[in-house]
Amino acid sequence: MSSESMKNKHRNSKRTPSPLQKERRRNWESHKSRSRSPIRRHGEKNLEYAHHSNQENRQSSYTALKTSDQATKTKEKTSGGNRTNPYTVFSQHRANHSDAPGWCGFYWHSTRLARDGTNCIFNEMKQEFQELQINGKITWDNARELLFSQKKKLDQKYRNMLYHFRHSPDCPRCDYWDNVYRRHLAHVSSQESEEVTDEEMLSAVESMDTNASN
């Protein structure tokens, strides 16, 4: 065989890959394809994360809006409106009857005690808690002292009220103001005479204190 023929044969063998070369090429192509797949998966993860993040943002916005709406409705519901309590009834009555006696009676004293308890929580105990707290927390001993302090004050107020009712059964002021509130209850619907909330009670008392100072 001539040298030219040998060269052509060698050249043709280079052009036509052997089965082993083909297998190696397929493996290489497959490897390159797999090496690119993490990039695609990373991109897919980014898209999935962005979608999930958008859903969370929309959910957070919805929750915040719902909470705000609920707070607004609660504020509107407890803002007073046509609902009344003994404080508002008695102050309106006194404004129209300057000769009315001093406040007294079951409705007056029960409302006064409820007011005192509410005021203690919102003002006195809150201030005492802030003085004792460390990182927004207090010990059980501190909590117990706060509760007993409030109990002591309310116990004395209840004893005074019970003593008055026991030893002054015919108090004319009690009869007067109890009758005023009974007449009021006779003219209001059951819906309007619902139990007054702490917020309404505190607001009514503050309003009365302001009017009294003026």
Swiss-Prot record:
Q: Which GO terms fall under biological process for this protein?
A: positive regulation of RNA splicing; transcription antitermination
Q: Residue spans with biased composition (Basic residues)?
A: 33-43
UniProtKB keywords: Activator, Host nucleus, Transcription, Transcription regulation
Read off the InterPro entries from this record: Bocavirus_NP1
Where mainly located?
host cell
Q: Where is the composition biased (Acidic residues)?
A: 192-201
The residue ranges flagged as biased composition, category Basic and acidic residues, are 44-55
Region spans: Disordered: 1-87, 192-214
What superkingdom heads the lineage? Viruses
Q: Which family does it belong to?
A: Belongs to the Bocaparvovirus Non-structural protein NP-1 family.
What is its biological role? Answer: Required for the expression of the capsid proteins. Performs the splicing and internal polyadenylation of the viral capsid-encoding mRNA precursor, which allows its maturation and expression. Transactivates the viral promoter.
Q: What name does the UniProt record give this protein?
A: Non-structural protein NP-1
